[in-house]
Amino acid sequence: MPIIKLETKINAPVERVFDLARSIDLHKDSMSKYDEKAVAGVTSGLINMDETVTWEATHFYVRQNLTSKITAFDRPHHFRDSMVSGAFARFDHDHYFERSGAETVIKDIFDYDSPLGILGNIADFLFVESHLREMLEERNELIKRIAESDEWRKFLPS
């Protein structure tokens, strides 16, 4: 049961960072190298409590679908997306946001179990955990770049 923890500091208001983190459109941009598309549920705009999104993407040369649901929501402090169906045995991804001086700090906690028992544990050790960490880091770097520029206006309503 690996747990990935990340912390990212962003020079932008907490409300903006929170909303960018739940933007389906920004997520699509951050995962474009995996040809990730929102194919069902909320497919654009901002996702909210009890809403789902189904993503279609290619990871490890396999095209796959994953459906997640927002299972906790406290704007602008926290939201959780949890897997409903997909390649993992389960996952919960908690996103925490707090103001620290002039910065907003995102704290991600990605808690998951791979399928296939011991084989899944070996895959985690060899490549899955590092792949997931890299994806989350890339996504947060994009959120940071967009939140700290005027680009955020493309993703959030005025």
PLM regions: where:
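Short, surface-exposed coil-to-beta transition loops
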Residues: 3-5, 63-67, 90-93
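Alpha-helical coiled-coil heptad-repeat segments used for dimerization/assembly
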Residues: 22, 134, 138-141
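Beta-strand/loop substructures that line and gate deep hydrophobic ligand-binding cavities in soluble
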Residues: 82-134
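A short, structured loop/turn motif at beta-sheet edges
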Residues: 14-15, 72-76, 96-105
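Generic structural detector for well-ordered beta-strands
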Residues: 5-11, 56, 69, 96-98, ...
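Glycine-rich portal/gate segments that line the openings of hydrophobic small-molecule binding cavities
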Residues: 38-85, 105, 138-157
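Hydrophobic ligand-binding cavity/cleft-lining segments
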Residues: 1-44, 48
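Beta-strand elements of well-folded, non-transmembrane domains
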Residues: 10-12, 59-61, 72, 87, ...
